[in-house]
Amino acid sequence: FLSLIPKIAGGIASLVKDL
């Protein structure tokens, strides 16, 4: 489960950068 946190955080960060 802990290994998914960086993936989710990275995905959200990339989405915010696109905005």
Swiss-Prot record:
Positions of post-translational Leucine amide modification: L19
Post-translational modification, as annotated: Phylloseptin-1.2TR is amidated, whereas Phylloseptin-1.3TR is the name given to the non-amidated form.
Gene source species: Phyllomedusa trinitatis (Trinidad leaf frog)
Subcellular location: Secreted
Keywords: Amidation, Amphibian defense peptide, Antibiotic, Antimicrobial, Cytolysis, Fungicide, Hemolysis, Immunity, Innate immunity, Secreted
Top-rank taxon, per record: Eukaryota
Family: Belongs to the frog skin active peptide (FSAP) family. Phylloseptin subfamily.
Protein name: Phylloseptin-1.2TR
Spans through the membrane: none
UniProt function note: The amidated Phylloseptin-1.2TR has weak antimicrobial activity against Gram-negative bacterium E.coli ATCC 25922 (MIC=100 uM), Gram-positive bacterium S.epidermidis ATCC 12228 (MIC=100 uM) and against fungus C.albicans ATCC 24433 (MIC=100 uM). Has an anti-inflammatory effect, since it inhibits the production of the pro-inflammatory cytokines TNF-alpha and IL-1 beta, and induces the production of the anti-inflammatory cytokine IL-10. Has an activity of stimulation of insulin release, which may protect the species from being eaten by predators by causing fatal hypoglycemia.
One cellular component (GO) term of this entry: extracellular region
Residue stretches in coiled coil: none
GO biological process: defense response to bacterium; defense response to fungus; innate immune response; killing of cells of another organism
Tissue specificity annotation: Expressed by the skin glands.
